[in-house]
Swiss-Prot record:
It comes from the Archaea. Belongs to the ArgJ family. This is Glutamate N-acetyltransferase. Pathway: Amino-acid biosynthesis; L-arginine biosynthesis; L-ornithine and N-acetyl-L-glutamate from L-glutamate and N(2)-acetyl-L-ornithine (cyclic): step 1/1.
């Protein structure tokens, strides 16, 4: 595994502070999607402005301090950081994306972050080691790295993400960086990214809490000398984006704080896509459903209640609810309660990956969402961690 052509990465973690750098040897077209939380962090405001201009040269990420709800001082910290990293990279400061993750209400120690960034810069590179060092540097409560790679014919797309708690994006803390060496226009990148994020990152939930710092950034530097639309088909590039983002989204949920099971919610038979998405997210977000999954309890009534609470069109006489895993499938409701084998249901739900399949019985639209179970360990982690 290597970074796409022309990208260099690195990272360091020390004294509870992580610093990661991404640098492109060529200027990049850039696109981004960001949290809709009304108390957005200062770096989100800055990075969205960079993405709106459509050109970037580098990224700095710090973990440990979210720099959210920190007022004007926090925004000045972002500008100071961007200025220092721009000087380091030999780029304009308005081409530096700045991202932060960590404790809300805490300003970042800019001088220390810049000092660590200079150390990272001395050993920045494209190898698997450099990619993994960046990935580890941006982690907070994560227990696993989240990396995905798509390799095309003469080009590639690398995705690196972090996130384990406060995951209920609308684009937890969730950060994702997508790097490709194909060429593309910023407006096209923004359109493709928005569509893919809506079907992947915006359909995951760990705890229903939307962070102040959620950011997904896509950088395309054209170093492969291949362009989307002429050398690489738009269809293939969109497929690559979807595959990488889907893999990252699943890894985030699988690594949810305290999680023991990945939940995949598949909703079919909805009247339209909006309602399918709403129903899928409602099920994946339900604490009662998540707790039942942890207990390996086939409590289909909680799923039905979540669907009803989503205010979507559903035909009770056609409604179907089933659980599916590597251990088999069990139907629990089909126009009415179904007598099922409780022992088989327990086996189906004992798997580490469980699908909840729901047919609303009113149309042809479908959607998919990802979630995880709710465990005692989640409560312990968040009782002790200051968000």
């Amino acid at each position: 595994m290597r970074a796409p052509e022309g990208f260099l990465l690195g990272g360091i973690k020390r004294e509870g502070i992580g610093v990661g750098l991404i640098f492109s040897e060529r200027r990049c077209a850039v696109a981004g999607t960001f949290t809709e939380n009304t108390l957005r962090a200062a770096p989100v405001e800055h990075s969205e402005e960079v993405c709106d201009r459509g050109v970037a040269r580098g990224v700095i990420v710090n973990s440990g301090h979210a720099n959210a709800m920190t007022g004007e001082e926090g925004y000045q910290d972002v500008l100071r950081t961007a200025e220092a990293i721009a000087e380091l990279m030999g780029a304009p400061e308005d081409e530096i994306v700045v991202c932060s993750t960590g404790v809300i209400g805490e300003r970042p120690p800019v001088d220390k972050i810049v000092r660590y960034a200079r150390e990272v810069w001395e050993d920045i590179g494209p190898t698997e080691r450099h990619v993994r060092e960046f990935s580890r540097a941006i982690m907070t409560t994560d227990t696993e790295e989240k990396i995905a790679l798509y390799e095309g014919d003469g080009w590639s797309l690398l995705g690196i993400a972090k996130g384990a708690g406060m995951i209920h994006p609308n684009m937890s803390t969730m950060l994702a960086f997508l790097l490709t060496d194909v060429g593309a226009k910023p407006k096209e990148l923004q359109m493709w990214l928005r569509d893919v994020v809506n079907d992947t990152f915006n359909m995951i939930t760990v705890d229903g809490d939307e962070s102040t710092n959620d950011s997904v950034v896509l950088l395309a530097n054209g170093s492969s000398n291949l362009k989307v639309g002429s050398d690489v088909t738009i269809t293939e590039f969109q497929r690559a984006l979807e595959e990488v983002c889907t893999e990252l989204a699943e890894k985030i949920v699988r690594d949810g704080e305290g999680a023991t099971k990945l939940m995949i919610v598949c909703v079919h038979g909805a009247s339209n896509e909006v309602e399918a998405r709403r129903a899928a997210r409602a099920i994946a977000s339900s604490n009662l459903v998540k707790a039942a999954l942890f207990g390996e309890n086939p409590n289909w009534g909680r799923i039905g209640a979540a669907v009803g609470a989503a205010r979507v069109d559903v035909d009770p006489d056609e409604l179907r609810i089933a659980f599916r895993s590597s251990e088999g499938e069990i139907v629990t409701y089909e126009g009415g309660p179904v007598d099922f084998d409780e022992e088989k249901a327990k086996r189906v739900l004992s798997a580490s990956e469980v699908e909840i399949v729901v047919d609303l019985g009113v149309g042809d639209a479908s959607a998919r969402a990802w979630g995880c179970d709710l465990t005692y360990e989640y409560v312990r982690i968040n009782a002790e961690y200051r968000t």
